[in-house]
């Protein structure tokens, strides 16, 4: 596994495994164990996923030492504000039977994220978290937070895929020394991404799948992708991206697919903000 060095010196795997929507406890534990066995070391969960306990059980059962794993969770907005955020992280540690998290993110850029972020800073100083960051913070919110804190976020996890390439986000995250991480690198299969002629053609050129091409494209842009699957053979396939390199021409060809639009929703849409803030997770 290759690694990125975050702005505080912590090393983070360049590819991670996400467990969003894997709610069944036994299935979640199985897929995390399979992912670790396949070679993943970065495991990404969240308070809102409802599977922290299952992920924790898998971590306890694996033979891979804890210090070789990079475990991420995210604080949901119902736990924002200084006190609630701090308590919620301790509760997540207890659920997962962990002494520390490698990374904790604020899940959404709404409500009292400044207060919640101050809680993460204190937990970071106490050694309960090795690195802190945010998720879904588009450039305006990221800059707002970065200019109002003593500890600049180490990571910002946002939607990035060939149809939503986040060029502006990459510029501003790089400017402030924030590592960009990609959720939904495959757009959850939307818009025919796996049968896209351009991506299929590039994959054939390197004898790689569309998924491998997308993950390689992200890695070459300096972005850490979070792949998600419940099939072990696909987990292994998604890690097999370090034996080839996309040409500059192919990188530009993929860049031409950008529609600069989310495959899911816009965090700038008032209706989306109302929906997210109304979720009681």
Regions found by a protein language model. Give the residues of each.
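CE4/NodB-like, metal-dependent polysaccharide N-deacetylase domain
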Residues: 7, 85-105, 122-126, 178
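N-terminal binding-site loop/beta-alpha segment at the start of enzyme catalytic domains
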Residues: 1-69, 186, 280-281
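A short, structured active-site edge motif that brings together acidic residues
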Residues: 66-79, 102-109, 136
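A structural motif
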Residues: 40, 98-101, 129, 153
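Alpha-helical scaffolding within the catalytic cores
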Residues: 1-4, 53, 57-59, 89-91, ...
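Beta/alpha (TIM)-barrel catalytic core signal, keyed to glycine-rich beta->alpha loops juxtaposed to Asp/Glu
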Residues: 108-281
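Acidic-and-aromatic substrate-binding clefts and catalytic sites of carbohydrate-active enzymes
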Residues: 22-26, 46-54, 78-83, 109-114, ...
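Short, acidic/polar
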Residues: 23-36, 80-96, 115, 140-142, ...
